[in-house]
Protein backbone atom coordinates (compact mmCIF):
# COMPACT_ATOMS: atom_id res chain seq x y z
CA UNK A 1 0.00 0.00 0.00
CA UNK A 2 1.24 3.49 -0.82
CA UNK A 3 1.81 5.92 2.06
CA UNK A 4 -0.32 9.04 2.52
CA UNK A 5 2.68 11.33 1.97
CA UNK A 6 3.56 9.50 -1.22
CA UNK A 7 -0.03 9.70 -2.44
CA UNK A 8 -0.17 13.46 -1.81
CA UNK A 9 3.12 13.96 -3.63
CA UNK A 10 1.81 11.95 -6.59
CA UNK A 11 -1.35 14.06 -6.69
CA UNK A 12 0.61 17.32 -6.71
CA UNK A 13 2.94 16.07 -9.45
CA UNK A 14 0.22 14.67 -11.71
CA UNK A 15 -2.54 17.26 -11.17
CA UNK A 16 -1.06 19.79 -13.58
CA UNK A 17 -0.70 17.28 -16.40
CA UNK A 18 -4.24 15.91 -15.96
CA UNK A 19 -6.04 19.23 -15.43
CA UNK A 20 -5.39 20.92 -18.77
CA UNK A 21 -7.43 23.68 -20.42
CA UNK A 22 -9.40 21.23 -22.54
CA UNK A 23 -10.57 19.27 -19.47
CA UNK A 24 -12.02 22.37 -17.79
CA UNK A 25 -13.62 23.61 -21.02
CA UNK A 26 -15.24 20.21 -21.53
CA UNK A 27 -16.63 20.33 -17.99
CA UNK A 28 -18.18 23.73 -18.69
CA UNK A 29 -19.61 22.46 -21.96
CA UNK A 30 -21.11 19.32 -20.42
CA UNK A 31 -22.83 21.28 -17.64
CA UNK A 32 -24.08 24.02 -19.98
CA UNK A 33 -22.06 26.83 -18.38
CA UNK A 34 -21.17 29.70 -20.71
CA UNK A 35 -18.63 32.35 -19.74
CA UNK A 36 -16.96 35.45 -21.10
CA UNK A 37 -13.28 35.72 -21.88
CA UNK A 38 -11.77 37.75 -19.03
CA UNK A 39 -8.76 37.61 -16.72
CA UNK A 40 -10.34 35.18 -14.27
CA UNK A 41 -11.85 32.59 -16.60
CA UNK A 42 -13.08 29.27 -15.17
CA UNK A 43 -9.81 27.71 -16.33
CA UNK A 44 -7.75 30.12 -14.22
CA UNK A 45 -10.11 30.10 -11.23
CA UNK A 46 -10.37 26.31 -10.96
CA UNK A 47 -6.61 25.88 -11.22
CA UNK A 48 -6.05 28.51 -8.53
CA UNK A 49 -8.68 26.91 -6.34
CA UNK A 50 -6.98 23.50 -6.58
CA UNK A 51 -3.61 25.09 -5.77
CA UNK A 52 -5.23 26.76 -2.78
CA UNK A 53 -6.48 23.38 -1.54
CA UNK A 54 -3.18 21.55 -2.11
CA UNK A 55 -1.19 24.24 -0.26
CA UNK A 56 -2.06 24.04 3.43
CA UNK A 57 -3.49 27.14 5.13
CA UNK A 58 -3.52 29.30 2.00
CA UNK A 59 -5.90 32.25 2.30
CA UNK A 60 -7.61 33.85 -0.68
CA UNK A 61 -5.28 36.84 -0.37
CA UNK A 62 -2.28 34.55 -0.86
CA UNK A 63 -3.77 33.11 -4.07
CA UNK A 64 -2.98 36.36 -5.87
CA UNK A 65 0.74 35.56 -5.49
CA UNK A 66 0.46 32.11 -7.12
CA UNK A 67 0.17 33.54 -10.65
CA UNK A 68 1.52 36.37 -12.77
CA UNK A 69 -1.97 37.77 -13.39
CA UNK A 70 -3.06 40.99 -11.68
CA UNK A 71 -6.31 40.71 -9.67
CA UNK A 72 -7.57 41.19 -6.13
CA UNK A 73 -8.71 38.58 -3.63
CA UNK A 74 -12.27 39.93 -3.85
CA UNK A 75 -12.28 39.47 -7.62
CA UNK A 76 -11.09 35.87 -7.19
CA UNK A 77 -13.85 35.14 -4.66
CA UNK A 78 -16.54 36.60 -6.92
CA UNK A 79 -15.23 34.68 -9.94
CA UNK A 80 -15.27 31.46 -7.95
CA UNK A 81 -18.87 32.08 -6.86
CA UNK A 82 -19.97 32.51 -10.49
CA UNK A 83 -18.94 28.97 -11.42
CA UNK A 84 -21.77 26.44 -10.85
CA UNK A 85 -21.17 23.56 -8.47
CA UNK A 86 -21.75 21.05 -11.30
CA UNK A 87 -18.63 22.32 -13.07
CA UNK A 88 -16.48 21.68 -9.99
CA UNK A 89 -18.00 18.23 -9.57
CA UNK A 90 -17.33 17.31 -13.20
CA UNK A 91 -13.73 18.53 -12.98
CA UNK A 92 -13.13 16.67 -9.71
CA UNK A 93 -14.44 13.39 -11.11
CA UNK A 94 -12.25 13.76 -14.20
CA UNK A 95 -9.20 14.48 -12.06
CA UNK A 96 -9.86 11.52 -9.77
CA UNK A 97 -10.17 9.10 -12.69
CA UNK A 98 -7.01 10.47 -14.29
CA UNK A 99 -5.01 10.32 -11.07
CA UNK A 100 -6.18 6.79 -10.34
CA UNK A 101 -5.12 5.64 -13.79
CA UNK A 102 -1.73 7.35 -13.50
CA UNK A 103 -0.96 5.74 -10.13
CA UNK A 104 -2.18 2.27 -11.10
CA UNK A 105 -0.36 2.24 -14.42
CA UNK A 106 3.04 2.90 -12.80
CA UNK A 107 3.02 0.23 -10.10
CA UNK A 108 0.89 -2.05 -7.99
CA UNK A 109 1.69 -0.17 -4.77
CA UNK A 110 -1.81 1.32 -4.63
CA UNK A 111 -3.41 -2.14 -4.30
CA UNK A 112 -3.85 -4.48 -1.35
CA UNK A 113 -2.77 -8.02 -2.28
CA UNK A 114 -3.70 -7.21 -5.88
CA UNK A 115 -7.15 -5.85 -4.97
CA UNK A 116 -8.31 -2.26 -5.18
CA UNK A 117 -9.37 -1.28 -1.65
CA UNK A 118 -12.23 1.20 -1.21
CA UNK A 119 -13.48 2.71 2.02
CA UNK A 120 -16.97 4.09 2.62
CA UNK A 121 -18.11 6.10 5.62
CA UNK A 122 -20.43 8.93 6.57
CA UNK A 123 -19.92 12.18 8.44
CA UNK A 124 -21.62 15.51 9.09
CA UNK A 125 -20.55 19.06 8.24
CA UNK A 126 -21.87 22.37 9.54
CA UNK A 127 -22.79 25.08 7.04
CA UNK A 128 -23.73 28.79 7.06
CA UNK A 129 -27.13 29.64 8.52
CA UNK A 130 -29.06 30.59 5.37
CA UNK A 131 -32.70 29.69 4.56
CA UNK A 132 -31.82 27.61 1.47
CA UNK A 133 -29.46 25.32 3.39
CA UNK A 134 -31.87 25.01 6.31
CA UNK A 135 -34.66 23.87 4.01
CA UNK A 136 -32.41 21.45 2.14
CA UNK A 137 -30.47 19.80 4.99
CA UNK A 138 -32.14 20.70 8.29
CA UNK A 139 -30.65 21.00 11.78
CA UNK A 140 -29.95 18.56 14.62
CA UNK A 141 -32.66 17.82 17.16
CA UNK A 142 -32.81 19.88 20.33
CA UNK A 143 -31.70 23.14 18.70
CA UNK A 144 -33.90 26.16 19.35
CA UNK A 145 -35.17 28.02 16.26
CA UNK A 146 -32.69 30.66 15.14
CA UNK A 147 -29.81 29.33 17.27
CA UNK A 148 -28.31 26.47 15.29
CA UNK A 149 -26.68 25.88 11.94
CA UNK A 150 -27.74 23.52 9.14
CA UNK A 151 -25.84 20.25 9.04
CA UNK A 152 -25.40 18.07 5.96
CA UNK A 153 -24.78 14.35 6.01
CA UNK A 154 -21.97 13.25 3.69
CA UNK A 155 -21.31 9.74 2.46
CA UNK A 156 -17.77 9.47 1.10
CA UNK A 157 -16.12 6.79 -1.03
CA UNK A 158 -12.32 6.84 -0.66
CA UNK A 159 -9.65 5.01 -2.64
CA UNK A 160 -7.47 3.63 0.16
CA UNK A 161 -4.36 3.21 -1.96
CA UNK A 162 -4.05 6.89 -2.87
CA UNK A 163 -6.38 8.64 -0.41
CA UNK A 164 -8.42 10.14 -3.25
CA UNK A 165 -12.10 10.86 -2.64
CA UNK A 166 -13.85 9.16 -5.54
CA UNK A 167 -17.32 10.55 -4.86
CA UNK A 168 -19.37 12.38 -2.21
CA UNK A 169 -23.12 12.18 -1.67
CA UNK A 170 -24.68 15.08 0.30
CA UNK A 171 -28.06 14.48 1.92
CA UNK A 172 -30.19 15.87 4.78
CA UNK A 173 -28.83 15.51 8.29
CA UNK A 174 -31.25 12.75 9.35
CA UNK A 175 -30.20 10.37 6.57
CA UNK A 176 -28.73 6.96 7.32
CA UNK A 177 -25.53 5.92 5.58
CA UNK A 178 -27.13 2.81 4.11
CA UNK A 179 -29.77 4.78 2.18
CA UNK A 180 -27.17 6.53 0.03
CA UNK A 181 -24.73 3.71 -0.72
CA UNK A 182 -26.60 2.62 -3.85
CA UNK A 183 -25.59 5.93 -5.48
CA UNK A 184 -21.92 4.97 -5.11
CA UNK A 185 -22.11 1.41 -6.41
CA UNK A 186 -21.22 2.47 -9.97
CA UNK A 187 -17.66 3.13 -8.76
CA UNK A 188 -17.27 -0.43 -7.45
CA UNK A 189 -15.63 -2.74 -10.00
CA UNK A 190 -15.22 -6.52 -10.05
CA UNK A 191 -12.52 -7.79 -7.69
CA UNK A 192 -12.68 -4.63 -5.55
CA UNK A 193 -12.72 -4.84 -1.75
CA UNK A 194 -15.15 -2.46 -0.04
CA UNK A 195 -14.45 -1.71 3.63
CA UNK A 196 -17.28 -0.28 5.76
CA UNK A 197 -18.63 -0.12 9.29
CA UNK A 198 -21.62 -1.95 10.77
CA UNK A 199 -24.09 0.40 9.06
CA UNK A 200 -23.52 -1.53 5.81
CA UNK A 201 -23.86 -5.01 7.33
CA UNK A 202 -27.15 -5.99 5.71
CA UNK A 203 -28.37 -8.73 3.38
CA UNK A 204 -29.35 -6.19 0.72
CA UNK A 205 -25.93 -4.54 0.40
CA UNK A 206 -24.00 -7.79 0.63
CA UNK A 207 -26.11 -9.11 -2.24
CA UNK A 208 -25.80 -5.98 -4.40
CA UNK A 209 -22.02 -5.86 -4.00
CA UNK A 210 -21.55 -9.58 -4.59
CA UNK A 211 -23.62 -9.25 -7.77
CA UNK A 212 -20.96 -6.80 -8.94
CA UNK A 213 -18.35 -9.50 -8.19
CA UNK A 214 -16.82 -7.35 -5.43
CA UNK A 215 -15.69 -8.40 -1.97
CA UNK A 216 -17.11 -6.80 1.20
CA UNK A 217 -15.53 -6.44 4.64
CA UNK A 218 -17.83 -4.97 7.29
CA UNK A 219 -18.20 -5.10 11.04
CA UNK A 220 -21.08 -7.23 12.31
CA UNK A 221 -24.23 -5.27 13.11
CA UNK A 222 -25.02 -4.95 16.81
CA UNK A 223 -28.32 -6.82 16.31
CA UNK A 224 -26.68 -9.69 14.46
CA UNK A 225 -26.16 -12.71 16.72
CA UNK A 226 -22.90 -14.54 15.98
CA UNK A 227 -22.05 -17.92 17.52
CA UNK A 228 -18.75 -19.68 16.75
CA UNK A 229 -19.70 -23.02 18.31
CA UNK A 230 -18.99 -25.83 15.85
CA UNK A 231 -22.06 -27.61 14.53
CA UNK A 232 -24.52 -25.34 16.33
CA UNK A 233 -28.08 -25.02 15.02
CA UNK A 234 -29.54 -21.89 13.49
CA UNK A 235 -32.72 -20.03 14.36
CA UNK A 236 -34.88 -21.98 11.93
CA UNK A 237 -33.47 -25.37 13.00
CA UNK A 238 -34.54 -24.99 16.63
CA UNK A 239 -37.98 -25.35 18.27
CA UNK A 240 -39.81 -22.08 18.88
CA UNK A 241 -39.12 -22.18 22.61
CA UNK A 242 -35.34 -22.36 22.01
CA UNK A 243 -35.04 -19.67 19.33
CA UNK A 244 -34.38 -16.77 21.71
CA UNK A 245 -30.76 -15.66 21.30
CA UNK A 246 -30.05 -18.15 18.50
CA UNK A 247 -28.10 -16.99 15.41
CA UNK A 248 -30.01 -16.75 12.13
CA UNK A 249 -27.02 -17.78 10.03
CA UNK A 250 -26.90 -21.50 9.18
CA UNK A 251 -23.58 -23.09 10.14
CA UNK A 252 -21.59 -24.58 7.24
CA UNK A 253 -18.08 -25.30 8.50
CA UNK A 254 -15.30 -23.96 10.72
CA UNK A 255 -12.18 -22.41 9.21
CA UNK A 256 -10.30 -22.04 12.49
CA UNK A 257 -10.61 -20.44 15.90
CA UNK A 258 -13.36 -17.76 15.78
CA UNK A 259 -13.55 -18.24 12.01
CA UNK A 260 -16.43 -19.92 10.18
CA UNK A 261 -18.61 -20.05 7.07
CA UNK A 262 -22.34 -19.48 7.50
CA UNK A 263 -25.33 -19.14 5.20
CA UNK A 264 -27.77 -16.21 5.36
CA UNK A 265 -31.31 -16.60 4.03
CA UNK A 266 -33.34 -13.87 2.35
CA UNK A 267 -36.53 -13.12 4.32
CA UNK A 268 -39.23 -11.10 2.57
CA UNK A 269 -40.38 -9.50 5.83
CA UNK A 270 -36.96 -7.85 6.27
CA UNK A 271 -37.01 -5.97 2.95
CA UNK A 272 -35.61 -2.44 3.55
CA UNK A 273 -37.96 0.46 2.90
CA UNK A 274 -35.62 2.03 0.32
CA UNK A 275 -35.69 -1.08 -1.93
CA UNK A 276 -38.77 -2.16 -3.93
CA UNK A 277 -40.10 -5.58 -3.01
CA UNK A 278 -39.70 -6.77 -6.62
CA UNK A 279 -35.97 -5.92 -6.56
CA UNK A 280 -35.61 -7.56 -3.15
CA UNK A 281 -37.13 -10.78 -4.45
CA UNK A 282 -34.63 -10.82 -7.33
CA UNK A 283 -31.71 -10.98 -4.90
CA UNK A 284 -30.14 -14.39 -4.21
CA UNK A 285 -32.22 -16.48 -1.83
CA UNK A 286 -29.09 -17.48 0.10
CA UNK A 287 -25.63 -15.99 0.73
CA UNK A 288 -22.49 -17.69 1.99
CA UNK A 289 -20.65 -15.35 4.35
CA UNK A 290 -17.42 -15.72 6.30
CA UNK A 291 -17.68 -14.64 9.94
CA UNK A 292 -14.55 -14.10 12.00
CA UNK A 293 -13.58 -12.37 15.21
CA UNK A 294 -10.29 -10.73 16.06
CA UNK A 295 -9.07 -8.36 18.74
CA UNK A 296 -7.19 -5.12 18.20
CA UNK A 297 -4.67 -4.54 20.97
CA UNK A 298 -2.88 -1.20 21.14
CA UNK A 299 -0.81 -0.18 24.09
CA UNK A 300 -2.58 2.53 26.05
CA UNK A 301 -5.94 1.92 24.33
CA UNK A 302 -8.94 -0.19 25.17
CA UNK A 303 -8.98 -3.62 23.53
CA UNK A 304 -11.67 -3.91 20.84
CA UNK A 305 -13.09 -6.98 19.15
Which residues make up each language-model segment?
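Single, function-defining residue in the core of a domain
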Residues: 1-57, 62-63, 70, 76-83, ...
